[in-house]
Amino acid sequence: MDDLRDTLMAYGCIAIRAGDFNGLNDFLEQECGTRLHVAWPERCFIQLRSRSALGPFVGKMGTVCSQGAYVCCQEYLHPFGFVEGPGFMRYQLIVLIGQRGGIYCYDDLRDCIYELAPTMKDFLRHGFRHCDHFHTMRDYQRPMVQYDDYWNAVMLYRGDVESLSAEVTKRGYASYSIDDPFDECPDTHFAFWTHNTEVMKFKETSFSVVRAGGSIQTMELMIRTVPRITCYHQLLGALGHEVPERKEFLVRQYVLVDTFGVVYGYDPAMDAVYRLAEDVVMFTCVMGKKGHRNHRFSGRREAIVRLEKTPTCQHPKKTPDPMIMFDEDDDDELSLPRNVMTHEEAESRLYDAITENLMHCVKLVTTDSPLATHLWPQELQALCDSPALSLCTDDVEGVRQKLRARTGSLHHFELSYRFHDEDPETYMGFLWDIPSCDRCVRRRRFKVCDVGRRHIIPGAANGMPPLTPPHAYMNN
């Protein structure tokens, strides 16, 4: 649809039928083939399709839409079209709406779902910015930092981690302001690493379970990350906030690159490793957003072997009125100039982001969410030891006992501290090993994670509510 009003009306018709899937399908049959503009990217469209006109996805519809395995709240979903644009195959990205109005995208190639927005109104603002796949494609990449010779040199090496590390060592410290148009990244700066504390001292927050208010040594950082990454990797830099007057960089997450060129973040407040980007170029486009709020949902094994952060639930407790998408109260919000934060405001924002993540993980465990099984044992132990646990719950001891009940023996992880290398499957071997394939690394990660877990599957994770009309069509 070329007319903006007609496009908005079409989105509105979809939104108001979120609770009536049969009515929604009737509308889609009438509008089948219609192309709707999206907020981002500009050259992409959603081609509306009914549930019987989605090609190979029809055979997967029951699993994806009705079994609740792909989203945190086991929400019923309904497809309403596929993404059409440069670089995409037909039916590769299927767009769905949840029974409570959330907008999702199923990636057929990667067998995962991205939660694009909690409401249709938010989707009209953000488009597909929360779908990682777009940020891996050159046509849609928009960096959040200003490229210079340093970045260009680093991006040339891709999977050559040794040369990349040598380049960072040679050039030394450099910081870059993060320009996030939607203000979703809690960090204000990214900085390349340096050991020279006279140039800049990397300092952790008081929430850190590693070095509260201090600085971690590079080798200790590697020792903590290698049981998760399980292959050769190097330190690239850090995300957080730079305070030039004090020559300090307040770290929210350290940034590492493995031998395959994948970028990870190490969170010292959670003793956790999160996948940030598929490569350095994608990292410049998303920075620390995936290490703050991850929108990718997938099965437990896939989430663990990819080191995906547990996704943040955006579902409102009460289904919002779909008609709010026509409100104009904040349409000009994004056009206003953003205020430059003071150091105090920037530091407070980092602490708020860290606290939010801690509270999110505690809630997963206390509510027996299926996503709690995605947490690594080190994360559970870090929650037990966290100085911020009292901010997350009133029953600190009760929560601590529940966290410990989920944590198995950490002896398997302690091998890395003792530097035992008699067994090729120890972490000292992982640190220097350059495996021949990604499959070996994935196998190691899943094995290592489950060794340290206890009571992997909570009671609530095994069952799903029975299918009831209008969802019965999924079995047909």
Curated annotation (Swiss-Prot):
Keyword ATP-binding: no
GO cellular component, as recorded: viral tegument
Any Gene Ontology biological process: symbiont-mediated suppression of host apoptosis
InterPro entries attached to this UniProt entry: US22-like
A Pfam family per the record: US22
Alphabetized UniProt keyword annotations: Host-virus interaction, Inhibition of host caspases by virus, Modulation of host cell apoptosis by virus
Family, similarity comment: Belongs to the herpesviridae US22 family.
Assembly mode: Interacts with host pro-caspase-8/CASP8; this interaction inhibits CASP8 activation.
Summary of the function given for this chain in its UniProt record: Plays a role in the inhibition of apoptosis by interacting with the pro-domain of pro-caspase-8/CASP8 and thus preventing its activation.
Protein name: Viral inhibitor of caspase-8-induced apoptosis
Species of provenance: Human cytomegalovirus (strain Merlin) (HHV-5)
Chain's gene name: UL36
